[in-house]
């Protein structure tokens, strides 16, 4: 993945860097608090059988995000 897309496009084992957050207010703050800031590397670790939620490794922590939240994170591939 070398172009921009959302975090939902990552497959298990793929990594990308956060380019932007497509949300404002409290949700933006929550995402920043868990480490989703510009330039941070994110790895898709595991997708649940139904595809929602998805576990991501963010700054060494394993974080589960719902698909609707992952769709608000713009990433650029590695």
Give the role of each language-model region.
Residues 51, 71-78:
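Glycine- and charge-enriched low-complexity intrinsically disordered segments
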Residues 12-68:
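Amphipathic, hydrophobic secondary-structure cores in small proteins
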Residues 1-20, 76:
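SH3-family beta-barrel domains
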């Amino acid at each position: 993945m070398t172009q921009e897309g959302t975090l939902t496009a990552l497959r298990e084992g793929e990594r990308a860097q956060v380019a932007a957050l497509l949300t404002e207010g409290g949700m933006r703050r929550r995402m920043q608090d868990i480490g989703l800031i510009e330039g941070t590397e994110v790895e898709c670790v595991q997708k649940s059988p139904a595809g929602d939620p998805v576990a991501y490794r963010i700054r060494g922590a394993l974080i589960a995000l719902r698909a609707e939240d992952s769709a608000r994170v713009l990433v650029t591939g590695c």
